[in-house]
Amino acid sequence: MAHKKAGGSTRNGRDSNPKYLGVKRYGGELVKAGTIIIRQRGTKTHPGVNVGCGKDHTLFALKDGTVKFHTGGALNRKFVSIEE
């Protein structure tokens, strides 16, 4: 009689989809209003002048202009702004 024992189970059979996070427009680039500048988890970089923050912490341009990255504030945080 041909028999085959049951194969053992593995705990590694999962893989999540890529999230495509990161900087989408770099310093000095011209952007239009609504352009996504950074996709991130949490406020690693904070919104500055003319930059909005979505509910998933995506930073986007509120006006047309040039992207500028800088640090500042009491806690020396990273900011991104749009200069018109």
Swiss-Prot record:
GO terms for cellular component: cytosolic large ribosomal subunit. SUPFAM superfamilies: Ribosomal L27 protein-like (SSF110324). Transmembrane segments: none annotated. The keyword Ribonucleoprotein applies. Keywords: Ribonucleoprotein, Ribosomal protein. Gene3D superfamilies: 2.40.50.100. GO terms for molecular function: structural constituent of ribosome. One of its GO terms (biological process) is translation. Pfam families: Ribosomal_L27. Residues 1-21 are annotated as: Disordered. NCBIfam families: L27 (TIGR00062). Belongs to the bacterial ribosomal protein bL27 family. HAMAP family: Ribosomal_bL27. This is Large ribosomal subunit protein bL27. The gene is rpmA.
